């Protein structure tokens, strides 16, 4: 509620997902991913808005839209703009949050831009990576070629896949009813995730995003993470105890997360899978995720 020109109350609406209500402040995540804070004292009324009917066909998306959605799902601790490039750092936790996202022109000659990049990461005692996408309209094949010509090496490649969310939520996965959903990763979740040298840093990084959910099966048999951002639900960190593989647990985790994302109004899904992970690729094939584009992390020459 705000004061109008005449001094009388003027009412405004905010539509989104209530992601927290703490110390008298409501945090609402809008469909575009923007977060809005509302003082409890200014709240006049609230109601549940039914989710739009879920789309059953595969979603359409541009490379830039997906790149920005993915970036919001793995947010850095610090970032700096260089023209249309974003330099990101997070103390080395994940390449995605510790690489340049080059969505356009850096605004200066490429050699000067790369010099700025390597210097920026060196000051943080981090290797310099540039995330380059290929295989879709608007991707960066030319930039990749220029980096290779300058001695940068592609170390890791991953597919970005997309699909309709509703079929993931509808999949027959009895263990989905056992999945525990939380807003923060607990010790059991982090223990199964395994890629953690600094638990405090991991927790700080993993909870960042528009609307983040963590899924855990009892005993840490399987885990997953999902970030709901407008129409998109992004799946990550789907990990299964090796002793319980081929039991449908990864599917169960994804089904439980998908159902929660559908409740929040999402209709489309995305995920990233490294190209040398045939087991995960087979899982996502079965859930009808299709490749949208591929990205590569190029590392600066030593």
What does each of the following model-derived ranges do?
Residues 67-78, 86, 110-201, 213, ...:
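Acyl-donor-binding surface of acyltransferase catalytic domains
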Residues 110-119, 237-240, 246-263, 281-286:
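Conserved acetyl-CoA-binding loop-helix of GNAT-fold acetyltransferases
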Residues 132-139, 242, 271-281, 298-302:
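Conserved beta-strand-loop-alpha-helix junction that forms the acyl-donor binding cleft
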Residues 147, 284, 289:
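Conserved active-site tyrosine of GNAT-family acetyltransferases
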